[in-house]
């Protein structure tokens, strides 16, 4: 059986960059994933949109670990939430469980706690800071580990957009907590998540460690990273491919939106074909510069029929896509840093239950959002246009 036969109906794309026609070329190369052929899933996913529910589930999983724990987070704060995780990790390490914790040195820079880190190490937890500042290699500091992963005994994995901090807790932070999304699943995906964790932990690019199996026809979900020597645009290609193949709707949620040519072109083309293309972004971005860059992309999208909504009540941090029967959940924003620079990880699935749960959550979010009107947008003042220009010029640092 040929490789293309094994891949079934998979359609694959060379991730070579920005040309508007490049995402239409199909090659037999699974490292450049376009539209994989997955079987329909059976509802084995748990979706979390409240930090308290997620943290309780993660800590319960940590407490039940028997062999090993792998935790990776962009932000680990020395607050009540971080303290709960630290205690659980330390307890399991003292019980003989192999506990490894990899967190980003810049993401956690604003909430440092030497005492907390020392307590973890004293308990036997292995810690690593990803890309701390180095005068010898300053350029490395601009590539971050933005992934959020917890793997328990290579049997269960949690991943998504939630960091470990109090701002995600309704109980501790109140109604102003962040709006985010995470997913939990057991089985083969946990083993593959462990492989990806190990690859970054060991700073290796092992060719034998591949998150995408040879044959995807019997797989209901994939973990797709954007770190590959052969393809530096895997996530952009994935989104552009699914949007280009859409037949009914495209519902995107992202806190930072600075699309590359492939994604922007695919969204506009889909809207012109009559597809219901919607984009949900925050009204108030943090930092404000990110909002300027996001709004710089509005006009061409609106003119082609893309509907844009701005989320109002609180900070939006979720990164999800619901495209016909497909769902994507993970750590990646639709911006330059997430698509092309940082380490990210997303789950892509073809599961009716997961799709409906995320689609319903999207519709609920739209009830708390304001739609951007093209006629009113075209009347915006000189100051808005000026700061959009600044955002457009600096979009590659987002």
Name each model-derived stretch.
Residues 2-398:
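Charged, low-complexity intrinsically disordered terminal segments
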